[in-house]
């Protein structure tokens, strides 16, 4: 029972983060599940099963509020679904003990990318004439992001969100809505790949329902939270958290000398704290709390 409550909290925390940033539900929840000793394939399968429900709810909400660029969604869902299915089949064939440290390394690198992006490259997009993706851009982007999402348990948001933010004409809210809406197809495709490769018997449905419950509870809270807190600060906090969780797995797997473990954790914590303080100095204490009006004014 205690583990189910913990998994529900993991789902809640992950959805709060994803609903605020448009990324990191899969990365956060998979990282925490791996920390509990769950094999990479089962962890990723559980997360994607839960995401079928959470991404559907998120997508409907974004469509309702006009936060979706439908053309971009159509361009990404087919190549993304193919990549997710192939990634799920690939991960399912790897032995859990062999794959775990490498998946943690991949997630740690994604966490580092999220942290660096929000630390140094955060620039709210301005509304300009929309320049859509062409096939040479959308197909490789969808396949790579879908494959990364299935193999790492997360990656659709961290890969697609910064690419779309760099495009002209898509405001941050539309980027988040487009990524979240298209992720439903990715979750369905990855789930199909896992169920075909792993079978139903390896899935713990109580874990899945716990993750779903936490995510459903967090969805409206996240919608409120994204209007209140500065996204740059949230991004740095999330990136550092992902690094710390996955660093624990890598340290335990690859560094036998336990005497140096506290030193490594201290160094990671110090760097993370420095990054948070740096962001606070950039945005100013008065700008930590953002209102919906402030955000929408920047987008227009």
UniProtKB/Swiss-Prot annotation:
The chain crosses the membrane at residues 4-24, 33-53, 76-96, 102-122, 139-159, 206-226, 231-251, 260-280. It comes from the Bacteria. It is a multi-pass membrane protein. One of its GO terms (cellular component) is plasma membrane. It is found in: Cell membrane. Belongs to the 4-toluene sulfonate uptake permease (TSUP) (TC 2.A.102) family. The gene is ytnM. InterPro entries: TM_pro_TauE-like, TSUP/Inactive_protease-like. The lineage of its organism: Bacteria, Bacillati, Bacillota, Bacilli, Bacillales. Keywords: Cell membrane, Membrane, Transmembrane, Transmembrane helix, Transport. This is Probable membrane transporter protein YtnM.
């Amino acid at each position: 029972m205690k583990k189910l409550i913990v998994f529900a909290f993991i789902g809640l925390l992950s959805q709060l983060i994803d609903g605020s940033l448009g990324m990191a539900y899969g990365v956060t929840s998979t990282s925490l599940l791996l920390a509990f000793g769950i094999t990479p394939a089962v962890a990723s399968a559980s997360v994607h099963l839960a995401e079928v429900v959470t991404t559907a709810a998120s997508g409907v909400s974004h469509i309702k509020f006009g936060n979706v660029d439908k053309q971009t969604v159509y361009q990404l869902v087919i190549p993304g679904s193919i990549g997710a299915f192939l990634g799920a089949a690939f991960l399912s064939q790897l032995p859990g003990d062999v794959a775990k440290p490498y998946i943690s390394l991949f997630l740690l690198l994604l966490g580092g990318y999220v942290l660096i992006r929000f630390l140094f490259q955060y620039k709210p997009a301005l509304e300009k004439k929309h320049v859509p993706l062409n096939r040479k851009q959308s197909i490789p982007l969808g396949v790579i992001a879908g494959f990364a999402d299935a193999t790492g348990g997360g990656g659709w948001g961290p890969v697609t969100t910064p690419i779309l933010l760099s495009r002209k004409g898509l405001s941050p809210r539309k980027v988040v809505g487009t990524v979240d809406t298209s992720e439903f197809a990715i979750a369905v495709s990855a789930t199909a790949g896992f169920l075909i490769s792993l079978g139903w018997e390896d899935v713990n449905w109580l874990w899945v329902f716990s993750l779903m419950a936490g995510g459903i509870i967090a969805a409206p809270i996240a919608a409120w939270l994204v209007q209140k807190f500065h996204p740059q600060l949230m991004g740095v906090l999330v990136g550092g958290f992902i690094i710390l969780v996955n660093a624990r797995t890598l340290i335990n797997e690859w560094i036998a000398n336990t005497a140096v473990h506290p030193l490594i954790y201290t160094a990671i914590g110090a760097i993370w704290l420095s990054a948070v303080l740096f962001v606070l100095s950039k945005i100013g204490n008065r700008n930590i709390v953002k209102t919906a009006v402030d955000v929408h004014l920047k987008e227009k």
